[in-house]
Amino acid sequence: MKLTIDRSAFLRPLGHVQSVVERRNTIPILANVLLKARNGRVQLTATDMDMDILESVSCNILQEGSLTVPAHILYDIVRKLPEGAEVSLEADGENSRVLVLAGRSKFTLPFLPADEFPAMSDEELPCRFSLGSDDLKALIDKTRFAISNEETRYYLNGIFFHASKTSDVPMLRAVATDGHRLARVEIPLPEGAKEMPNIIIPRKAIAEVRKLIDDWSDDIDVSLSETKICFSIGDIILSTKLIDGTFPDYERVIPSGNDKNMRVS
């Protein structure tokens, strides 16, 4: 594999994928990012075995190929290079090394074979719909502060999403609670989401999705099953396992028939 790419164009997807990689890994290849260079693009993939992220970006490919390199180290190298630098990556198969060049800077990184990288699951995700980026931001921002950090109650370690009705109007609700406070927010149910199962998206996945959509203004394609959800955000695909548990009946703790209202702005 041999390619050249603009430093800024490479840094953005590297920042996204390295964020998924755990700092400590008992399986060495999980500390790596998979790079696949083909058809004028380099595809970056990372996983922690619960969550996968894939992103591709245009580059100048001199020799197609694929390999895996330490994600955090490569990100730190590219991040510290000067703006406007051209980055060159060249694999040395005999020594299992990757040469990273940029101007006078030269780095050598070890690599592991691409075929040792965990294969992404190909699960059928039958429920599909689109969400506006502002809607998804609101669903996350208005609930995630209430996500529990208590690992023993794992079913509270995420945001509960489900289809419901308010005054007979179909709605998509997001709910989070830590047992002391509860946040619930809803938006009109997107077309195609009527048959969606009740799901709990883990805290880490919520944080990663929120970072990815921070500067995104277009719609986000969502596909899901009872065990997995996938977000397509432009050239980025993030998928995660869902929390296998039952969210408590939160509506029982919300008082009804209140005759007093307060608006805070």
How should each PLM-predicted stretch be described?
Residues 1-265:
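Structural preference for solvent-exposed beta-strand-turn elements
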